[in-house]
């Protein structure tokens, strides 16, 4: 039996022209002449026929049954089986009418009331101050209406020269800088034995490396040539004072390279220096400096790579808080400077338009869009409500109007993040189904971004590098520890600036693709995208472009932390977990006949992890639990059995991530406790380090421990604390219970090379200024000119180290000697 249908599919006001059946009976007092056909079932019976449960003919206005007794024939919905409640439709119609009237009245009120200022913004003149970097003043409505319009003479710019000394003092105290050496970090001075000329050359290298890496895609410091010259002039300057903004930018570049500052102190001192900068000529530089700090803190903290503790477990949360704070600070700077307004529409209060600042206008546009990208990107990946509506309300100049070819990659990224995904809730997108239109729109925009990268040849692959074919090509040759070591030591590739731009753009696409990928996607799998992401990070991890001449900066693993404006370590951990989960799912299917493709994929993943893990987990072979899981699931090689020769150790010298960070942490904590670290560091005798500078490039594999070694060798002992002294009575002591003493041999040519070494050290800071430091060649004087001179007769340097039953090592075996020294340091500190 067919299912009964309710309702009608035709109008009661029409007649069926193709049938003789009458659907509507003419109205009248009597229906005796009406032609009825009871063979047609009516859709709705009247109320009386329903109650009586009799057949209703549905005639209008009265059915036959109601007409017989003159009963008012009515049809309502109150007795309908599947109908809506009585009056529901009428109620909806009334609500629609009410809302329509309300909308019309609100529109009328809006048109009749005061206009919104953003809509009439360009109808009147907008003023700014006439300075190198302009300050936005608005319409100056009050001044115009009160006839007190200011003139150029009324504008007085604050001279912040008095604040410079305070800013430099804050930087010195917060970040442990050495005020006598051009405010360089004491960490670097001790690390490189006060070899100032070498340190100057090294800083020049890392400045160029910064503009090649972090500043390649996002132009944080723009124009690059201007900033390069400012930074190079800063490290070559002989003046004791300088511009704090440039100095702080240099310190951020140092932090990118050595990670030697505490992040909390760096954040606090950044806000202090910016707040104390009152010179309006530095507005644009301040804005770019804060953009640089935002980029840095978006990359999280290096403390997250240490073992979890009460101090490090909240490091990533702190980075989020600090980034939000700095974004709000720069948003205020944007409003004050009026960067969202076309400069041609701004009128200086002096009445003279300055048309000779086209270059400055370009710098303002690039800086504005750099901030807009950072703000939109951070809102996307952190789920922050959108509060920056400058681009929608005022539509400032696009970066494409500059027509600068090197800005094209940045323009492509801007169009994707700001114009396609601005205000998007990434968490909401990832929770949608594949068939949802919003999810499909997001994926279409993501694929359009990839197509643009491919169109402009900006999509980077591991296959672009010939020396990495052993990671991608399938070989029947079984991988052994010797072959693995040969492959790793042969990775001497150098990435250039276009490579870094392409890698960053590709990582933006792959990271978003990985986080929003669904399990049911047949085209892409999470493990495949994870491997592609890890391969790009492997290129950066093994990049050797900044390790020429064995300069030994920070461990190579730390170079991944602040390469992009997101936490790269979280992405790496996610990718490794995806590979591990895939291997577990493959084990569950081991009882079935596995396809040949799964076996090939397993071998590809296994080959890559065999090359990734020895570098990424170099100093965690036995302590990292996740590495042990990977070794079991992918049957990785026993990395602990790899034997490195002395030359191979030199190639893998900068992989001791944990030891390096512990040394930095110990140095920073000791400087805080002592509260006079800068004084101690400046009292080190220049001539005491002459022998170590000559063979600096032959440093220990753990060269960061020279921070402690310098203090250890030159510590001033005023009293006898139980150590062996070099007097005749103790030398003649025949007590066998005394510990073994091995004196350090002093260099015989120290005095001969004294003048040469001194001139080399002072070449960075020649005495060209009356306020500069006056270095004295007297050996009894210290580096610090303000400290009292101490005669060498009162100095007792520690020339002996007590060895507790350690083997005596000859001087010709340098590697063993360094290892023994390392043991001494470990047992001492």
Curated annotation (Swiss-Prot):
Residues 722-741 are annotated as: Disordered. It comes from the Eukaryota. Residues 46-73 bind DNA. GO terms for molecular function: DNA-binding transcription activator activity, RNA polymerase II-specific; DNA-binding transcription factor activity, RNA polymerase II-specific; RNA polymerase II cis-regulatory region sequence-specific DNA binding; sequence-specific DNA binding; zinc ion binding. Gene3D superfamilies: Zn(2)-C6 fungal-type DNA-binding domain. The keyword Transcription regulation applies. It is found in: Nucleus. PROSITE patterns: ZN2_CY6_FUNGAL_1 (PS00463), ZN2_CY6_FUNGAL_2 (PS50048). Residues 722-734 have a biased composition (Acidic residues). GO terms for cellular component: nucleus. One of its GO terms (biological process) is positive regulation of transcription by RNA polymerase II. Keywords: DNA-binding, Metal-binding, Nucleus, Transcription, Transcription regulation, Zinc. It holds the Pfam family Zn_clus. InterPro entries: Yeast_MetPath_Reg (IPR052202), Zn2-C6_fun-type_DNA-bd_sf (IPR036864), Zn2Cys6_DnaBD (IPR001138). Interacts with the SNF1 protein kinase. This is Protein SIP4.
């Amino acid at each position: 039996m067919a299912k009964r249908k309710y309702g009608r599919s035709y109008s009661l006001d029409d007649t069926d022209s193709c049938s003789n059946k009458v659907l509507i009976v003419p109205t009248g007092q009597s229906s005796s002449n009406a032609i009825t056909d009871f063979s047609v079932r009516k859709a709705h019976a009247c109320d009386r026929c329903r109650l009586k449960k009799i057949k209703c003919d549905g005639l209008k206005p009265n059915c036959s049954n109601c007409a017989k007794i003159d009963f008012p024939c009515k049809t309502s919905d109150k007795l309908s089986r599947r109908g809506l409640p009585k009056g529901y439709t009428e109620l909806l119609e009334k609500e629609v009418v009410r809302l329509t009237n309300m909308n019309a009245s609100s529109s009328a009120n809006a048109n009749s009331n005061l206009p919104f200022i953003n809509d009439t913004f360009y109808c009147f003149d907008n003023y700014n101050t006439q300075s190198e970097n302009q300050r936005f003043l608005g319409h100056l409505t009050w001044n115009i209406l009160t006839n007190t319009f200011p003139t150029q003479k009324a504008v007085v710019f604050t001279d912040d020269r008095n604040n410079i000394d305070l800013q430099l003092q804050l930087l010195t105290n917060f970040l442990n800088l050495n005020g006598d050496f051009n405010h360089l970090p004491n960490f670097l001075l001790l690390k490189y034995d006060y070899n100032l000329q070498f340190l100057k050359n090294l800083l020049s290298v890392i400045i160029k490396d910064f503009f090649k890496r972090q500043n390649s895609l996002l132009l944080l410091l723009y124009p690059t040539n201007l900033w390069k010259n400012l930074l190079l002039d800063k490290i070559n300057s002989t003046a004791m004072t300088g511009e704090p903004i440039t100095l702080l930018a240099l310190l951020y570049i140092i932090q990118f390279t050595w990670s030697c500052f505490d992040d909390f102190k760096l954040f606090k001192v950044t806000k202090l220096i910016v707040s104390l900068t009152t010179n309006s000529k530095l507005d644009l530089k301040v804005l770019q400096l804060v953009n640089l700090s935002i980029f840095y803190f978006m990359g999280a903290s290096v403390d997250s790579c240490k073992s979890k503790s009460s101090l490090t477990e909240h490091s990533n949360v702190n980075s989020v808080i600090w980034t939000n704070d700095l974004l709000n600070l720069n948003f205020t700077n944007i409003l004050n400077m009026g960067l969202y307004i076309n400069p041609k529409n701004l009128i200086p209060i002096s009445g003279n338009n300055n048309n000779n600042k086209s270059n400055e206008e370009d710098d303002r546009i690039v800086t504005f869009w750099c901030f807009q990208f950072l703000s939109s990107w951070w809102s996307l990946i952190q789920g922050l409500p959108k509060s920056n509506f400058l681009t929608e309300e005022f539509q400032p100049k696009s970066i494409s109007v500059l027509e600068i070819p090197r800005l094209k990659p940045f323009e492509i990224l801007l169009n994707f993040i700001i114009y396609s995904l601005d205000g998007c809730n990434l968490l909401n997108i990832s929770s949608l189904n594949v068939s949802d239109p919003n999810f499909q729109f997001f994926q279409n925009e993501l694929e359009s971004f990839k197509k643009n990268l491919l169109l402009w040849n900006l999509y980077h692959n591991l296959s672009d590098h010939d020396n990495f074919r052993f990671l991608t090509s399938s070989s029947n040759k079984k991988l052994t520890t010797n072959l693995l070591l040969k492959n790793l030591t042969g990775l001497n590739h150098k990435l250039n600036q276009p490579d870094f731009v392409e890698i960053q753009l590709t990582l933006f696409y792959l990271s978003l693709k990985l986080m929003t990928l669904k399990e049911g996607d047949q085209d892409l799998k999470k493990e495949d995208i994870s491997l592609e992401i890890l391969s790009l990070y492997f290129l950066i991890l093994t990049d050797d472009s900044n390790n020429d001449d064995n300069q030994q900066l920070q461990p190579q693993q730390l170079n991944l932390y602040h390469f992009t404006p997101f936490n790269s370590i979280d992405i790496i951990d996610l990718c490794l977990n995806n590979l591990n989960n895939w291997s577990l799912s493959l084990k569950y299917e081991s009882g079935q006949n596995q396809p040949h493709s799964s076996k090939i994929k397993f071998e590809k993943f296994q080959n890559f992890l065999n090359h990734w893990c020895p570098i990424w987990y170099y100093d965690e072979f036995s302590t990292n639990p996740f590495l042990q899981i990977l070794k079991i699931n992918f049957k990785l090689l026993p990395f602990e059995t790899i034997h490195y020769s002395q030359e191979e150790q030199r190639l893998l010298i900068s992989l001791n991530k944990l030891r390096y960070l512990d040394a930095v942490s110990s140095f920073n904590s000791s400087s805080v406790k002592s509260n006079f670290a800068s004084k101690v560091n400046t009292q080190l005798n220049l001539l005491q380090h002459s022998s170590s500078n000559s063979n600096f490039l032959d440093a220990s594999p753990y060269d960061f421990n020279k921070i402690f070694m310098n203090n250890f060798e030159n510590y001033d002992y005023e009293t006898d604390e139980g150590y062996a002294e070099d007097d005749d009575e103790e030398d003649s002591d025949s007590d066998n219970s005394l510990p073994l003493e091995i004196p350090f041999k002093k260099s015989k040519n120290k005095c001969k090379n004294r003048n040469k070494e001194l001139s080399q050290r002072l070449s960075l800071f020649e005495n060209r200024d009356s306020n500069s430091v006056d270095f004295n060649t007297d050996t009894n004087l210290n580096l610090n000119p303000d400290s009292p001179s101490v005669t060498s007769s009162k100095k007792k340097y520690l020339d002996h180290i007590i060895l507790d039953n350690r083997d005596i090592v000859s001087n010709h075996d340098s590697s063993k000697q360094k290892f023994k020294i390392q043991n001494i340091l470990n047992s001492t500190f």
